């Protein structure tokens, strides 16, 4: 893709956004239902393309966490479909009166929510973001330009094609949703300069991506949290609740960027809490690493009974 191709793509998306902004709630929900139907119909093709991306990433020796974020399964497609259903069920964010007052000159002043226009989204490995973001943008009346990671390109192209075909079937402009298929990093930087056509940029990924967007983007940007993912267990903690929170924060999806990294336990609750926590984690895909303090208190040679647990062995961890 050349710079002019990118500009042409953003112009088309910008023009389409003017049509989408006038869609009624019923229009948007019907369109999302059609996208839901077509993704469900094409799940085999989605999985086929995803397998190509997975194999390419394995050939590049990507690690387990990376492959896990990249991988789509029947279950993950069900979650994608559930996500669209949940978005359909949301109240329309457009057209809400958030302030209404009469000024001194008797003029009625109203503050009403409207679409932003065109949203650019740069994300990394996870292809399910393609449907999440597209659905949220349609629901909020915004057109979107997607820039996914090169490793998930085949899956993203497949998903975007299904969405664009749904737009055509609905009888509207398929430029509501566009995907930048180039893997050239120069194109990414050019993308961040197009504030004439893009109203907001959202990076979804690691610290380096977020910092790069914050530094390079000429349009406003919204960045997600990339901060500390720690949990502290206080002596006053409800042990059962604390274990449940830790498991949900880590074991439910350990490969994502906001999964729990560090567990800090107060020494007063450590003798009671740690053995129960270890038992709960023993069947998860998490590898527990701990300071010698824990080892001295409990004489734990290894919380999983061997030098590496069965899940860690599958991941090639030592």
Predicted regions and their residues:
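A general secondary-structure junction signal
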Residues: 50, 54, 181-183, 292
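ALDH superfamily catalytic-core signature
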Residues: 12, 125, 132-143, 162-169, ...
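Internal helical hairpin/lid segments
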Residues: 317-318
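N-terminal Rossmann-like NAD(P)+-binding subdomain of aldehyde/semialdehyde dehydrogenases
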Residues: 1-108
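Rossmann-like NAD(P) dinucleotide-binding subdomain of oxidoreductase/dehydrogenase enzymes
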Residues: 89, 98-240
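General structural feature for long, well-ordered alpha-helical segments within catalytic domains
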Residues: 5, 9, 16, 27, ...
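Short amphipathic alpha-helical segments at helix-loop
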Residues: 65, 69, 144-148, 262
């Amino acid at each position: 893709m050349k710079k002019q191709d990118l500009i042409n793509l953003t112009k088309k998306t910008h023009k389409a956004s003017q049509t989408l902004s006038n869609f009624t709630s019923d229009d948007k929900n019907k369109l999302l239902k059609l996208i839901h139907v077509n993704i469900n119909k094409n799940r085999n093709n989605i999985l086929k393309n995803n397998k190509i991306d997975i194999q390419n990433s394995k050939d590049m020796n990507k690690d387990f966490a990376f492959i896990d974020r990249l991988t789509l399964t029947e279950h993950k497609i069900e979650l994608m479909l559930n996500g669209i259903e949940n978005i359909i069920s949301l109240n329309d964010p457009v057209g809400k009166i958030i302030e209404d007052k009469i000024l001194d000159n008797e003029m009625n002043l109203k503050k009403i929510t409207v679409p932003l226009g065109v949203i650019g989204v740069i994300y990394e490995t996870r292809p399910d973001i393609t449907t999440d973001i597209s659905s949220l943008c349609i629901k909020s009346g915004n057109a979107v330009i997607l820039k996914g990671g090169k490793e998930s390109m085949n899956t993203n192209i497949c998903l975007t094609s299904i969405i664009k075909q749904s737009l055509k079937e609905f009888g509207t402009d398929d430029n509501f949703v566009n995907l930048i298929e180039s893997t050239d990093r120069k194109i990414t930087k050019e993308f961040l300069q197009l504030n004439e056509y893009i109203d907001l940029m959202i990076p979804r990924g690691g610290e380096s991506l977020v910092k790069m967007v914050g530094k390079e983007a000429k349009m406003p940007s919204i960045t997600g949290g990339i901060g500390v993912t720690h949990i502290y267990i206080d002596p006053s903690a409800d042990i059962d609740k604390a274990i449940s929170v830790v498991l949900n924060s880590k074991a439910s999806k350990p490969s994502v960027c906001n999964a729990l990294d560090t567990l800090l336990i107060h020494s007063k609750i450590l003798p009671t809490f740690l053995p129960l926590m270890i038992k709960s984690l023993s069947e998860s895909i998490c590898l527990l690493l701990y300071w010698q303090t824990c080892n001295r208190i409990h004489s734990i040679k290894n919380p999983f009974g061997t030098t590496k647990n069965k899940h860690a062995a599958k991941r090639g961890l030592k």
